[in-house]
């Protein structure tokens, strides 16, 4: 069994991620050979992330580190892992670029021509909890995608 889930820093204060930890524990206890693929957030969700942080004409986003991955990279890695022998463990995956969360969202909005101002707010919430510097990035070795933000944005605009 190969299971795609969110990248989780344990212990976590984020309710969404606590639910993901519970799912992983069920898989581990099942006795079925498995590989859990923990992915950072997808680049394709940047629009909804910006929307969730919008407060009037500003977008409040944590300055914690962020390393989003393109869905095409996730699909390629997932297929590779699913076809390999189960590891009975975890594979972490992330995009090739790491930067503060607020800077990536600002870069995205600027590329869109969106006039909203992105404000670095250490108290900004994400999935119901506070984000610290390393909550959303792999802390150990991770398998990195190949598609950069610029390449992903170019492709996404061409497909629109």
What spans do the regions from the language model cover?
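Structural signature of the Rossmann-like NAD(P)-dependent dehydrogenase/reductase core
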Residues: 1-3, 36
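Oxidoreductase cofactor-interface core, primarily capturing Rossmann-like NAD(P)-dependent enzymes
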Residues: 8-117, 121-127, 133-134
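Amphipathic terminal alpha-helices
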Residues: 134, 139-160
């Amino acid at each position: 069994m190969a299971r795609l889930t969110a990248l989780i820093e344990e212990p976590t204060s984020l309710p969404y991620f606590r639910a993901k930890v519970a799912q992983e524990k069920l898989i581990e206890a099942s006795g079925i050979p498995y590989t859990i693929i923990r992915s950072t957030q997808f680049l394709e969700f940047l629009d909804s992330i910006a929307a969730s942080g919008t407060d009037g004409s500003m977008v409040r986003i944590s300055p914690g580190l962020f390393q989003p991955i393109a869905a095409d990279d996730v699909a390629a890695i997932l297929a590779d892992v699913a076809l390999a022998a189960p590891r009975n463990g975890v594979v972490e995956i992330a995009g090739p670029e790491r930067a503060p969360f607020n800077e990536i969202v600002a870069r995205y909005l600027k590329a869109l021509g969106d006039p909203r101002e992105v404000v670095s707010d250490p108290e900004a919430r994400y999935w119901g909890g506070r984000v610290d510097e390393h909550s959303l990035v792999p802390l150990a070795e991770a398998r990195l995608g190949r598609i950069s933000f610029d390449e992903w944005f170019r492709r996404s605009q061409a497909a629109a």
